[in-house]
């Protein structure tokens, strides 16, 4: 099958969307499909490399840290459109709602092929970056998503939470839930009797045998990492675990300041940004994966943590229903008391920790990269059968 993937983000950027799209790309290639990618370059220079089209872009940091948009005049539209039309994609799978989505629409118009779109970002959780009024921001996100759905044959939701939200928005195309997969060959429990774990903990100044809570991902306000620091401060000092943040982002200075304010510098570590191939070993540094975020759409880090054998202790969120099950592979908590109770239960019961570890591995096995790719391919076939690229929908093309 000839498949065009369109995403505003790609390596060397590190985030959940990039990991998801690149995993899909490599899985589709491994299955023998003809796959090309259009994405944004990290500068104003448009170029092609190994079947990937990089569109020149400019920074939009004032909107949100790390965001880029296609640069005016950077698109070699006629040359690339002619080339893609000659190639003839059977389906286009968009991963972003902005620059590459609009370019994908131009290709779809020429090739008369369906567009499948994965809705990775719950924009309701990001309205503070664009609007003074939260209500106005939510209304705008809903209306914009509904308009965008008119240019798609099918939308993919990474979780039931996102699917329910899209249905609440009354989007005009069918929505299918396809959880993001993980590479189980990369993520898994340690195979070296804990030697690497002990070494990495020693480098962080963490004594052997102490409990480590691990959070991995972008440090941004909407991820609510500050609550994790406050929850740690509320634990009894004599039995207080360590908290390790792996990742970087705009919220890091505030988190470091909060850590100092609460006198927790002796119990909190900031590992910073790590290379993608080093992510699995950092998960294994922890004993429990923790999160206070309610802005997740994929739950990718939860799956990865469980694939490394970590039980999950996370803020209750509909996106985790059926994934994190209380007492089976972790706990979902709603307040400080529930967090403290679950944490104490895990720490104080060695036999339970072993069971949680085994159940976490079993849960992660359901989200293999191979299963993920097959579900996406099934969605492509559904979109082709619908054959629903609407030629009368044209106004969005004027945005390019």
Residue ranges with predicted function:
Residues 1-56, 397-400:
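N-terminal subdomain of nucleotide-sugar transferases
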Residues 19, 211-234, 250-256:
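A conserved mid-protein helix/loop that constitutes part of the nucleotide-sugar donor-binding site
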Residues 39, 53-56, 138, 142-195:
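Donor nucleotide-sugar binding/catalytic pocket of nucleotide-sugar-dependent glycosyltransferases
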Residues 254-274:
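Nucleotide-activated donor-binding/catalytic signature segment of Leloir-type glycosyltransferases, i.e.
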Residues 273-274, 281-286:
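Short alpha-helical donor nucleotide-sugar binding micro-motif in glycosyltransferases
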Residues 294:
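Aromatic "clamp/platform" in nucleotide-sugar-dependent glycosyltransferases that forms part
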Residues 311-314:
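Short hydrophobic beta-strand element within catalytic cores of glycosyltransferases
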Residues 325-337, 345-351:
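Conserved acidic donor-binding segment of nucleotide-sugar-dependent glycosyltransferases
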């Amino acid at each position: 099958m000839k498949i065009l993937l369109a995403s505003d983000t790609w390596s060397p950027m590190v985030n959940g969307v990039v990991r998801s799209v690149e995993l899909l790309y490599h899985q589709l290639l491994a299955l023998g499909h003809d796959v090309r990618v259009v994405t944004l370059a990290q500068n104003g220079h448009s170029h092609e490399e190994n079947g990937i089209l990089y569109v020149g872009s400019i920074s939009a940091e004032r909107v949100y840290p790390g965001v880029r948009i296609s640069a005016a005049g950077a698109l070699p539209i006629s040359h690339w459109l002619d080339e893609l039309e000659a190639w003839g994609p059977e389906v286009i799978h968009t991963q972003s709602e902005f620059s590459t989505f609009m370019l994908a629409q131009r290709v779809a118009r020429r090739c008369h092929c369906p567009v499948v779109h994965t809705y990775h970002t719950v924009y309701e959780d990001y309205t503070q970056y664009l609007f003074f009024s939260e209500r106005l921001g939510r209304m705008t996100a809903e209306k914009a998503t509904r308009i965008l759905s008119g240019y798609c044959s099918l939308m993919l939701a990474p979780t039931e939470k996102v699917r329910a939200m899209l249905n609440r928005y009354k989007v005009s195309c069918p929505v299918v839930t396809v959880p993001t997969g993980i590479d189980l060959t990369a993520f898994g429990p340690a195979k070296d009797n804990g030697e690497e774990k002990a070494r990495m903990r020693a480098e962080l100044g963490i004594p052997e045998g102490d409990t480590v809570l691990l959070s991995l991902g972008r440090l941004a306000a909407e991820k609510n990492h500050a609550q994790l620091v406050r929850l740690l401060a509320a634990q009894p000092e004599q039995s207080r675990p360590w908290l390790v943040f792996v990742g970087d982002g705009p919220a890091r200075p505030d988190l470091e300041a909060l850590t100092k304010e609460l006198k927790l510098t002796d119990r909190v570590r900031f590992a910073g940004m790590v290379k993608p191939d080093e992510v699995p070993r950092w998960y294994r540094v922890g004993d429990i994966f923790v999160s206070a975020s309610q802005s997740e759409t994929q739950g990718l880090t939860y799956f990865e943590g469980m694939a490394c054998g970590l039980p999950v202790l996370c803020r209750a969120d509909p996106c985790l229903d059926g994934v994190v099950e209380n007492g089976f592979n972790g706990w979902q908590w709603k307040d400080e008391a529930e967090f403290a109770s679950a944490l104490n239960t895990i720490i104080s019961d060695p036999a339970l920790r072993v069971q949680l570890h085994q159940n976490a591995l079993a849960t992660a096995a359901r989200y293999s990269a191979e299963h993920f790719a097959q579900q996406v391919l099934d969605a492509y076939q559904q979109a082709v059968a619908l054959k629903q690229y609407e030629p009368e929908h044209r106004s969005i093309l004027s945005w390019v």
